[in-house]
Amino acid sequence: MNIGLFFGSFNPFHVGHKIIASYIRDFTKVQQVWFVVSPQSPMKTKKSLLDQHHRLMIIKMEIEDNVNLDVSDIEFGLPTPNYTIDTLLYLSEKYPNHNFSLIMGDDNLNNITRWKNYEKMLENYLIYVYPRKNVDMNIKHKNIHIVKDVPKIEISSSLIRRLISEKKDASY
């Protein structure tokens, strides 16, 4: 099975994540999308991070009606910090009958050269990139596929956190 891995802190998870995952599933070779909840990204601070189990449960509740979406806590049991390449290698070994690919936004693609063993990722895994804000993508590779026409949702986890801190409506 072709599994698209959508890594993130999902702090919090929102409808934009579901829309992107469903679109990638419907318009690429990905047959199922797994949201991989990262306990702590090596690229982010932990100061405002909700508990990892809480984030996992939120996603489980939000996707329970969609058999093409799943959530994984695989990184909870792996050594920290969690590096994407380590998780990919672990999953590839654990599930040899699956083909794994990555799902990421253009902002992450533009920073991929800062990731641990990014060259190995580029050589061994397809990467589906959803454009977010018309960012010029400065990296090209045969395994990078820009997914055109992904609905652009002007919502982000950081916006939701800001609205909550300002005691404004963040119900979307």
Where are these regions (language model features)?
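Nucleotidyltransferase catalytic core that binds NTPs
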Residues: 1-172
